[in-house]
Amino acid sequence: MKKTLMLLAMVVALVILPFFINHGGEYGGSDGEAESQIQALAPQYKPWFQPLYEPASGEIESLLFTLQGSLGAAVIFYILGYCKGKQRRDDRA
């Protein structure tokens, strides 16, 4: 019980602490950071690929990103569960 409470307190601290450490900081994505580095290193660079679909807003882009991650996690955990169930079935036989 004590160990569980200690782990829970650590998880809560890890979630909340970054908001106080970097208060007022800007949370940018890696795409934006990569784009700024490319522009700094090679200003003449022209992208050779355009996205097939450009979301109408940032909210839709976030939704699609979240759905993609959720679908990927569902596939991974389905496969893990399937393999675990198959292993249990084989152990019983």
From Swiss-Prot:
One of its GO terms (cellular component) is plasma membrane. The chain crosses the membrane at residues 5-25, 63-83. Pathway: Cofactor biosynthesis; adenosylcobalamin biosynthesis. Forms an energy-coupling factor (ECF) transporter complex composed of an ATP-binding protein (A component, CbiO), a transmembrane protein (T component, CbiQ) and 2 possible substrate-capture proteins (S components, CbiM and CbiN) of unknown stoichimetry. It is a multi-pass membrane protein. Its main location: membrane. This is Cobalt transport protein CbiN. It is found in: Cell inner membrane. The gene is cbiN. HAMAP family: CbiN. Keywords: Cell inner membrane, Cell membrane, Cobalamin biosynthesis, Cobalt, Cobalt transport, Ion transport, Membrane, Transmembrane, Transmembrane helix, Transport. Belongs to the CbiN family. GO terms for biological process: cobalamin biosynthetic process. Signal peptide: none annotated. It comes from the Bacteria.
